[in-house]
Amino acid sequence: MPTQLFTTTDDVVLTGRHWVRTDAPRAAVVLVHGFTASANDPAVCDVAEALHADGVDVVCYDARGHGTSEGHSTLGDLERHDVAAAVEAARERNDRVVLVGASMGAIAALRYAAHADGLAGIVSVSCPAQWRLPRNVQGVLAAGLTRTRVGRAVASRWMGVQVAPRWTNPEPPIGLVPRVQAPVAFLHGAADRFVPTSDAAELYEVAGEPRRLRIVSDMGHAFAPQSVPAIRDAVDWALAVEVRA
């Protein structure tokens, strides 16, 4: 699949990949990875290849501050501009675009969708409802990496992620979802140790119709082999229902 460069409206250059169908695609999917991931991660590629086999074009990219893209990660805030650039690229071949985002990527997708029209659907995977972290090892690690100077240095040196120096405290997903004017499916792993399944239920409760909630029994956090069948099914569902007026 060819490499592609996207430039966001705030002048950040992103490195992307485009899985292009040789026949006429039935839609396009923009795949938005989570924190510390990239477009080249095996789990991300597994999702992209499965969706591509289902008859859609797939656009994926390294979010700002990740992989070979420019900029600094803001954990789903300014990443809305990344999503916008990828959607624009996807629409060069197909107007029907579904966003599939995981964790930080789901936050970015919902933030973009709350102010956008014309999406065919959104699949939100492992998305938090509020800005709260679990009181376990995973929560302490996430807080340390993103909210302390030492943690940001560790993320840069050992994980290749450039984190913005300050947390912007943007509106949480629970406030964004009611403004989304597209079919939205919430997927969550029952074995997720970062974000509890109750967050998915909270987001589902405030979403408009059409909406869908699925808890996957053997799935953990974000993109993983166990999430692929559920994501494929959710994309099919989104494309089968009518977009709300």
Model features per residue range: what roles?
Residues M1-D23:
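N-terminal cap/lid segment of alpha/beta-hydrolase-fold proteins
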Residues T36-E49:
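The serine-hydrolase catalytic nucleophile loop
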Residues A48-E70:
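Conserved alpha/beta-hydrolase
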Residues R64-R93:
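Catalytic nucleophile-loop/oxyanion-hole region of alpha/beta-hydrolase
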Residues H115-R166, L176:
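Hydrolase active-site cap/lid region
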Residues V180, F186-H188, D192:
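Short beta-strand/loop motif that positions the catalytic acidic residue
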Residues R193-D199:
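Conserved alpha/beta-hydrolase "acid-adjacent" motif
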Residues M219-P229:
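Catalytic histidine-centered segment of alpha/beta-hydrolase-like enzymes
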